Amino acid sequence: MNKLFYIARSRIPSPRANCVQALKMCAGFAATLPVELVAPYYPEDARRRDFLREQFALARAFDVRWVPFPHWGDRFAVRGYALAAAAYVRIRGARLAYSREPWSAYWLARAGVRVGFEAHFLEEDRRHPVWGRLVGDSSLSPALGGIFCISRSLVEDYAAAGARRELLHLAPDGVDLQRFEPAVERADARKTLGLPAGQAVVCHSGHLYPGRGIEETLDALTLLPEVLLLLVGGTADDIERLRAHAAARGVQDRVRFEGTVPNGKVPLYLYAADALVMPYTSRTPTVRAMSPLKMFEYMAAGRPIVATDFPAVREVLRDGENALLVAPDGAEPIAAGLRRVLDDPELAGRISRRAGLDVREFTWERRADNILKVLGADHA
């Protein structure tokens, strides 16, 4: 059976979403064929091999190889790693690869290795000098088996920027449904986490970077005096900044900062909530073409979702059907959406149930299987 070599573009392990997504995809691919994840070598990372499955709640095991690479200064470090990763994959005699890194994808395709490239953010990808050749050079076919974009908006952006349309495939992100089974009762989750039993709890999971709408959500608390906001994730610097913002608004006693928690523990926090908030703003750099991991986790948790309304969000969430979508960039719409689901149990239950049904189409295994079919993995 063919082995798939997955070339990550980020450090493994890391709490960043691109690390989580790479690990989950490798576990998804591993449902069908053997997988080896290739990542940049840093001594402190390679010593944490046993930490990966426990921290990230991976459904299946796969091999991991941290590849040493020449550090040619910050400007060329990425290219140095990409060359080292591609060389390693070639030395291993690979016939099938998947890459988040444009240079590696290009070099492997030039060498005749069947490879898929995963695209997440056009503006970042096209900064690589090789990007234009990767997406536009017809001589790379058939080795370059496809460019897999996480949203329809990104497919259109790539096509408009010159990518060959026949290479572009839609591949939204996914979720491990097994992590949400069996479901945990709200009261039990709150008891485990030490949360108040009788207070309305709204939860946000994920990073707390500026522009992610957390400031607007804190402002919304001033309009929701009975609500406790549970923030799961975030760096120490972001938490400090947002603590100050909460104090300035007088809501600091109704915000609980959990910081980074193991990925496998995230469902417990979602189950503890009465509502889940996804408050992206127009300042979010990736807002046009994103496919947020939290969106699928929220859907799987069976709690009502209040999300800001952007085209990429509407590819999965539908206002009044499986979520409430509200105008971005302000506290009042977020507060109004949360008020609706908190005050209307029938609405909250209906959109939650629909989201739980819809998310079954978005598992990592299904995503991996669709990609492998495009790549013709049986024939690589």
Per-region residue spans from a language model:
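Nucleotide-sugar donor phosphate/pyrophosphate-binding loop at the beta->alpha transition
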Residues: 75-83, 111-143, 148, 156
